[in-house]
Amino acid sequence: MFEDEDKGKQPDNAWGPRRPPPGHDRYWPTVVAEIAYSETPSKLNSDVRFWLEGTGRNAQAVVTLIIDQKALRITVEKWQPQNSRAHRAQRITISKMNEQTTVEGGSLVVGFQELFLRPSDAPKETDFELGDQRLTLLATIIWEQQEQERELKELKKKKSGSRN
């Protein structure tokens, strides 16, 4: 649980350097993931603002996944602080129609410096990038999980109906 002056928040996932540079809170994440499956857009926007608009926070990016429960569509957004406000820097849509998955909006990129709060100083210290192939894999895993949940609900419904 991460807390500021007036409220606390548990992210769906979060990352940051083990040893941040001086002046940065080592317990506050630099990159946060928030996933909206049943949340309202206003709740998700509130979560993004919590991470990016407070004083003294290290969060450099918030990645949101908005999972459509009716259509095979996932929207990935990357938010960053800009002039002390949350600004959407990137929007990617992953959708599936007629067994064809489409990724629009390019690769999701989280910069090395956003995550570690310092420039890279070695060839292996690179940006984190999820291209079309990995985004498609992520979406496929989510959609398979959604299908399993639907099947489980139907099975429970049939079982409870047969008892009556």
Predicted regions and their residues:
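C-terminal interaction segment
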Residues: 1-164
